[in-house]
Amino acid sequence: MKSLFLFALFISISSFGQDITGQWNGVLKVQGTQLRLVFNVTKTDKDFSSTMDSPDQGAKGIPVTNTTFDNSKIKFEVANARIEYNGELKENEIVGTFKQGGQEFPMNLSRKAIEKEVVKRPQEPTKPYSYYSEDVTFENTKANISLSGTLTLPKKDGNFPVVILITGSGPQNRDEELLGHKPFLVISDYLTKNGIAVLRYDDRGVGQSKGDFKTATSADFATDVESAITFLKTRKEIKKNKIGLVGHSEGGLIAPMVASKSKDVSFIVLLAGTGIQGDKLLLLQQELIAKANGVSETDIKKSIETNSKLFEMVVKSNDNMKLKTYLTNSINETLKNDTSAEIPNGMTKDEFVSMQVNQISSPWMQYFMKFNPATTLEKVKCPVLAVNGEKDLQVPPKENLTAIKNALTKGGNKNVTTKEFLNLNHLFQECKTGAPGEYSTIEQTFSPTALEEIANWIKQQTK
C-alpha cells in the first residue's frame, strides 16, 4: 500500500513540475502550405488560459476557449474557428495533432520561435521594374463600386495594345495571389516586357477594391471587366482597337461573356477556361482530385452519387427557399444512412448541414452550376486562344478544350487556337501529378514555355 502511494505521489510531482506557461510555437502544414501558429499560455487561479496567434495571417490574440493540462496531456480549443489541438508534453516539446473542419494534421509545438520561411519564387519580378507601373482606380457604375488595380506599360509614353487579366474563382487580389504564388504578377511582367500593356485589379471586395464579393456571381464580375474596358479607352497610351482579355479558370468563363457582347474586345485568351456546364465540371473535378489523393473507388462513387443529386436540385431550382429545404432534407438523409460520414469537430450536425446548404445554394454557386459556357462561346467572333495543362485536375483539358473548340466552331469563329501543354497543372506549373497539394511546393509560378506561346499569339493579333 505504501509503494502504491509513493508511485501516485511521484506522478503528481512529475506533472506539477511540468511548466507549460509561456509561448509555444508550431508550423501547420496543409497541402504544401506552411502556416505558423503560436499558443500563449498563462496560469490562472484554478487552471490555465491562453490565446492563439497566426503571424502569417496577421492575426494576434485570438481567444482560446478552453485550455486544459493534465498528466502531460494538453488541449486547446478555439470554438469559433472549430479548432482543437491535442498534444502530449515530452521534455521541451508538445507532440500533437491539429484538428479543424473534420481534418487532422500532425503539428508539434516547441519553445523555439519560428521565423517565416522564405519561399523561393524566382519568377517574381523585383523593383525597380524596367517598365512603367501605375496604380489606378476605375468605376463600375452598374454596381456603384470602385475597383483598384495596376496598369503596366512598356514605356511611360507611347501607344500600346493591352490585356485585362481576369482572376479565377474565390476572392483574389490583382496578382491572383494564392498558395504563395502570384501568377498575374508574373504574367503581367512578362507581357509588359514584350510590348503589351497589362491591367490587373483586385476583385471586388478584395484589397483596395470596393463592393461585396460574397453576393456576386460570374455575371457581376463580367461587369467589372466591362468597366475596366471603359477605363482603358480613356487612356491615351492604349490602342483602343487592340484591347484583349486574358482569363484564368473562372476568368476563362467570364472573358467570353464580355467578348460575346462587346465590340471593344479584339481577342481573348482562356487559361484553363471552362467549356462544360458548371455542375458537370465540379463532379469531374471532385473525382480526379479524389483519385490523386488516394481516395478509394468505393468512396469516390458514393460521394459522386450524393453530390450529383444535390447538384441536380440546384440546376432545376428556381425558388431559393424551396431549394434550401430540399438540400437540408437530402443532406440529413445522407448523414442518417451513411454511418461513415463525419461531422467536423466542434460542430453540431445542424451546423454542419447548414454550412453545406449555404455553400451549395450561394448566389455564385447556383449561377456557376447552371451556366453552360457553350451558349456564350458560340457568340464569340473575335480571335480566341484556349490553353490548358495536361495535368489540370480542376479544369480537365480533354473535356473542356474540346467543348470550347466545338462551341466556337459551331458559332462560325474561324480564328480559334487550342493547345494542351504537357506536364502542366491548373496553374500552368511544371508538375508531377497535377494535384492541388503540389501547387505551393513548386518553385515555378508559370511555365516559361506557356508564357512565350501566349505572348507570341497576342503579338500576332495586335500587329
Language-model segments: which ranges?
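Accessory cap/linker subdomain of secreted extracellular hydrolases
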Residues: 271-378
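Alpha/beta-hydrolase fold nucleophile elbow
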Residues: 237-249
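Short beta-strand/loop motif that positions the catalytic acidic residue
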Residues: 380, 386-388
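Alpha/beta-hydrolase active-site loop
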Residues: 215-236
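N-terminal cap/lid segment of alpha/beta-hydrolase-fold proteins
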Residues: 114-158
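Short amphipathic alpha-helix adjacent to the substrate-entry channel of hydrolases
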Residues: 177-198
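Short beta-strand element of the alpha/beta-hydrolase
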Residues: 159-169
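Central antiparallel beta-sheet cores of small beta-barrel/beta-sandwich binding domains
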Residues: 18-90, 95-103, 130-131, 184
